[in-house]
Regions:
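Iron-associated oxidoreductase/ferritin-like identity signal
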Residues: 1-112
């Protein structure tokens, strides 16, 4: 784990967030390991097992992201602004999107 340094005197909330972030790092690392091993596997059955394990780790990472979104307002704000939108990711992050592609409604834009 790369986040072994913990500041003294942290609040319980900060410790919980640290644990979630450290766990997320570990899940992402495991996803990468399984993905690499699957990519070079020459045995079809082993590849299936590795893909299954990788996808389980993706589920774990998604659960941690959802916990962070619920508990950390900045995660909630940024995830709401950026995730599940179409168009250029940098433009979305800069707020350069129209109402038609903000993930709400039918994507018809302004009908006036």
């Amino acid at each position: 784990m790369s986040s072994t340094t913990i500041e003294a005197g942290l609040s319980e909330k900060a410790l919980l967030v640290h644990r979630a972030l450290a766990s997320l790092q570990e899940e992402l690392e495991a996803i990468d390991y399984y993905n690499q091993r699957s990519d070079v596997s020459v045995d079809g059955t082993l590849k299936e097992v590795l893909d299954h394990n990788r996808d389980d780790e993706v589920e774990h990472a998604a659960m941690l992201l959802e916990w962070l979104r619920r508990e950390v307002p900045a995660f909630d704000f940024q995830m709401g602004k950026i995730l599940f939108k179409s168009g250029s990711i940098p433009d979305i992050a800069k707020g350069k999107t129209s109402a038609a592609d903000d993930g709400r409604g039918l994507g018809l834009g302004d009908l006036k």
